[in-house]
Amino acid sequence: MEDRALLAVSTFCFLLGFAYTMFVLGSGRYRPSRFNFAAMIGGFVFQTGFLVERGHALNACPLTNLFEVLIFLSWSMVLLYFLVGTAYRISLLGVFTSPLAFIFQTVALISPIDSPPGPRARVAPQPWLETHAAISIVAYGAFALACVAGVMYLIQERQLKTHRLRGMFFYLPPIADLAVAINRLIFTGFILLTLGLLTGFAVRPEVEWSKVIWGVGVWLIYGGILQADKWRRVTPRRVAVLSVAAFSITLATLWGLNFLAPKGSL
């Protein structure tokens, strides 16, 4: 199966799981179900298959263009979902994670941002450089999941304030647990991004200032959120809002890198 076909199947799995859950929610008879979790597993398996096929064709980690970066980001987010979901009610975190994975992959599939590897596309491996890039994108995956948890927090807080407790509310994690999850995910992403930046400086003799500026900018944003939370300068609600806003800015950096960095150097 061609790598893009694997990606299309993965994207359909995420859409199927999300659509099923939305249908059940709309019927007013929501109950925790393994269907969405199974769809997430299917999507992840085909995501992994795509990355393996593309990596084999390139003889390198598949992070050579914005198309591959978006898929790797989606994969990282889903992987982290499986790692932390058991602590924060798998079914509901997956409901909010699957549409974001679907959006990332749909944008990648329909946008003219891919250059499929040809028979001469294989390049000399650069393990440390690939490690630097992969760590940085996994950090973005942690920020994406923090954004998802932030949305869940804001939905639950609104329902509590308006006293309109709908079916989904009773299956959301306690709001205090969501606040802790957001903080820990941001902290995890911050540490990974720090490692990514440090390894980037270590493995590249020349400095690409466009990447440095964007990367350090994201690092400062999330570092500021963590520091403000540590000093009790912001409420948990504000941290949730900032996690959503910060990830929106982070997504813009991916496009910024695509336009500002030298072609093919992602």
Which positions does each model-derived feature cover?
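Hydrophobic transmembrane alpha-helical segments in integral membrane proteins
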Residues: 1-17, 135-143, 264
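Membrane-interface interhelical connector segments
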Residues: 156-178
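Hydrophobic alpha-helical segments and helix pairs
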Residues: 89-132
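Interfacial loop-to-transmembrane junctions
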Residues: 224, 228-249
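Membrane-interface helix-loop-helix modules in multi-pass inner-membrane proteins
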Residues: 47-100, 112-113, 198-216
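Transmembrane alpha-helix/helix-exit interface in multi-pass inner-membrane proteins
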Residues: 138-163
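Membrane-interfacial loop-to-transmembrane alpha-helix junctions, especially the N-terminal start
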Residues: 30-42, 91-98, 182, 211-214, ...
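Juxtamembrane boundary at the C-terminal end of a transmembrane helix
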Residues: 252-266
